[in-house]
Structure formats: structure tokens, C-alpha cells
Amino acid sequence: MISAALAVLESEEQRNELSEIYENNISNFYNIAFQQLHNKHDAEDTIQEAFLAIAKNPGPFFDVAVNKRISYINVIIRNTAYKMRDKKHKVSENEIVLDDTI
């Protein structure tokens, strides 16, 4: 699921570490995203988007102490889920407004 994100990373060591974190914590990551979005596909998209964001700018993630990296990912997933939820909510509001004008 995060193969696109892993492909962006230049270091094999970073790819292995991020892949291992993903494999060991996917259930937790999914639960965080699903709690906000209540939709399986949106939760999966959120996780992929969060890992891609880390891969595109890996410096801050790999600068964090090893024991805090999962918490770091949790925050990114939660924030990404908030953004997706707000974006979908805004689209829904616009659809309602458009429907009222017809």
C-alpha cells in the first residue's frame, strides 16, 4: 500500500525502516484514520498520503528520536484525516447549496 512512498526514498535503510514501521503498526494507523473519516477507502488513502508526505520530506521524520517516530506518524495521519474530512465536508456543503438553488 505504501510502495509509492517507499519508492520516493533514496536510502534503502530509510525504506526498510519506514516499511517495518508500517507493517508493525498498520492496524493502529488505520484506526486513527477511520475514527475521523468513517470510511475504509478514505482511511486507506489517508495513510498512503501521510506516508507519501513523509517520504517526500524525510528529514524531519528521521531526525525524530526512534522511540517517537510512531507518534510522529500518528500525528501526520490524524492531521491528514482532518484535512480530508474537512475537504469532503466542504464539498458536501457546496453540493447542498447548489441543490437549493435549482
Task: List PLM regions with ranges.
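N-terminal module of bacterial RNA polymerase sigma factors
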Residues: 1-28, 35, 58-59
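Conserved RNAP core-binding helix
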Residues: 21-22, 40-60
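Arg/Lys-rich amphipathic alpha helix in sigma70-family domain 2
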Residues: 74-95
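Acidic, proline/glycine-rich intrinsically disordered inter-domain spacer in sigma factors
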Residues: 100-102
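Sigma70-family region 2
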Residues: 11, 51-66, 87-89
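Structural recognition of an alpha-helix C-terminal capping motif at a helix-to-coil junction
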Residues: 31, 45-52, 67-79
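Alpha-helix N-cap/helix-initiation sites
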Residues: 15, 19, 40-44, 66, ...
